[in-house]
């Protein structure tokens, strides 16, 4: 197969219809179309408004704690004996992950649009916590849809959301995971169009969500690019991030897309292996179709039915991925690779013991890829891994899997 011709820039998408090549778009019910167009108009206006930018910057700095640090993981780097590994410390943000970046931007949009009720979906609970947090900060009611399976395995985050005043609605349809929670949130939105803002947590969904979530998360890569130039005097050789829906990854990747010297690697949930259906590696083992308002790579059976998938990480068990990632895969700019549950668990423990940092299981997938790659690289090479969140929420899951009684 001929290698696709590289575009002049990888940063120009999406087009007016929300397409990244053949991916993206807005495949939604007619009742939602006016809302989607209203959101797009509000976003186009907001992103060119200095006041909006100033308010978002102030909240990011004084409320969320940005910029997050770029930290040289010396213990892990020396243990592996190859490339220098840097962590982009999104785990240090308020609420403990990258999710707050997007939530701050979207709550300001909701305010501009005059919406008085916030709904959100969540998998690992991090986006639910971030949504509940900013809803509390702005005095708005918040309903969070969460798969019943995830409610069970993420109890600390469920309690946090309730503490913050949010109503958590468990969804038992399907496998009771992120896909099902998103379905319910979309149903709610259709029936409450006047007053409700749907605060999507990942870079998927109908246009303009993939674009606006990417833009709000790109602060990660913008900072990391500047920080590595200050600390190493050059760009990294490799950047790595975990990909579920793909918001933390696109946030890191986007500012580096046109830097040809930087290799970019997205890490999918390989679960128990790609041979069966117990994984969530939609780009390694899926094919394009439509889900949640956009065309993208999805896990499907022979009849085109969406599969449920599996991952040890609640934040990665989504059977699809943001459309921009699908386009970046097909264009050849980004490599997407699967990491198995046991590899992520090993990396979780290794990071904890060599760095004194307990990473989220999502981030542990990215670290596992670093564990594979770094030893094959020279000691003069530099790698950035996005530490997308902290692992407090996962200690019970990991403890159970390791046979510990917590």
From Swiss-Prot:
Top-level taxon of origin:
Bacteria
- Does the keyword Amino-acid biosynthesis feature in the UniProt annotation? yes
* Class of enzymatic activity (EC top level): lyase
Q: What cofactor does this protein call for?
A: pyridoxal 5'-phosphate
Which PROSITE patterns did the record assign? TRP_SYNTHASE_BETA (PS00168)
* One cellular component (GO) term of this entry: cytoplasm
Show the Gene3D superfamilies listed in the entry: 3.40.50.1100
Q: Ribonucleoprotein: is it a keyword of this entry?
A: no
Reactions the enzyme catalyzes: (1S,2R)-1-C-(indol-3-yl)glycerol 3-phosphate + L-serine = D-glyceraldehyde 3-phosphate + L-tryptophan + H2O
A Pfam family per the record: PALP
Q: What is its EC number?
A: 4.2.1.20
| Involved pathway(s) | Amino-acid biosynthesis; L-tryptophan biosynthesis; L-tryptophan from chorismate: step 5/5
For this UniProt entry, the molecular function terms from Gene Ontology, in alphabetical order, are:
tryptophan synthase activity
Question: For the modification N6-(pyridoxal phosphate)lysine, which residues carry it?
Answer: 99
Disulfide linkage: none
Q: Which keywords describe this protein according to UniProt? A: Amino-acid biosynthesis, Aromatic amino acid biosynthesis, Lyase, Pyridoxal phosphate, Tryptophan biosynthesis
Family as reported in the entry's similarity comment: Belongs to the TrpB family.
Q: What is the protein's known function?
A: The beta subunit is responsible for the synthesis of L-tryptophan from indole and L-serine.
On assembly, the entry states: Tetramer of two alpha and two beta chains.
- How is this protein named in the record? Tryptophan synthase beta chain
Q: Which organism is it from?
A: Brucella suis (strain ATCC 23445 / NCTC 10510)
Upper classification of the source organism reads:
Bacteria, Pseudomonadati, Pseudomonadota, Alphaproteobacteria, Hyphomicrobiales
């Amino acid at each position: 197969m001929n290698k696709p011709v590289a575009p002049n820039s990888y940063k120009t998408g999406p087009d007016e219809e929300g397409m990244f090549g053949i991916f993206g778009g807005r495949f939604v019910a007619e009742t939602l179309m006016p809302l989607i167009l209203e959101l797009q108009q509000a976003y186009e206006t907001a992103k060119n408004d200095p006041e909006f930018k100033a308010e978002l910057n102030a909240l990011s700095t004084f409320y969320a704690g940005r910029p997050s640090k770029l930290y040289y993981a010396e213990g892990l780097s020396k243990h592996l004996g190859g490339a220098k590994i840097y962590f982009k410390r999104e785990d240090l943000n308020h609420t403990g992950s990258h999710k707050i970046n997007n939530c701050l931007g979207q709550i300001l949009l909701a305010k501009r649009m005059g919406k008085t009720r916030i709904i959100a979906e969540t998998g690992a609970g991090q986006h639910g916590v971030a949504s509940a947090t900013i809803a509390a900060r702005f005095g708005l009611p918040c309903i969070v849809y969460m798969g019943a399976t995830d409610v069970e395995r993420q109890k600390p985050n469920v309690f946090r959301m309730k503490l913050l005043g949010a109503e958590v609605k468990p969804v038992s349809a399907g496998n009771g995971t992120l896909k099902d929670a998103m379905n319910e949130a979309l149903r709610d939105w259709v029936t409450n169009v006047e007053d409700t803002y749907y605060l999507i947590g990942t870079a998927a969904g109908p246009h303009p969500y993939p674009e606006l979530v990417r833009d709000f998360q790109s602060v990660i890569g913008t900072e990391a690019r500047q920080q590595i130039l200050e600390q190493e005097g050059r760009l990294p050789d490799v950047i790595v991030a975990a990909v579920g829906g793909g918001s933390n990854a696109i946030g890191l990747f986007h500012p580096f897309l046109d830097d040809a010297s930087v290799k970019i690697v997205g890490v999918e949930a390989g679960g128990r292996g790609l041979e069966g259906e117990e994984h969530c590696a939609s780009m390694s083992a899926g094919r394009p179709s439509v889900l949640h308002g956009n065309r993208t790579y999805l896990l499907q059976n022979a009849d085109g039915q969406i599969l449920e998938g599996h991952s040890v990480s609640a934040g990665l068990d989504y059977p699809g991925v943001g459309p921009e990632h699908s386009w970046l895969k097909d264009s050849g700019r980004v490599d997407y690779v699967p990491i198995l549950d046991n590899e992520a668990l090993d990396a979780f423990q290794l990071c904890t013991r060599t760095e004194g940092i307990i990473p989220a299981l999502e981030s542990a997938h990215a670290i596992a890829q670093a564990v594979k790659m770094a030893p094959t690289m020279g000691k003069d090479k530099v790698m950035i891994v996005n530490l997308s969140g902290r692992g407090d929420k996962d200690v019970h899951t990991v403890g159970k899997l390791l046979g510990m009684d917590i």
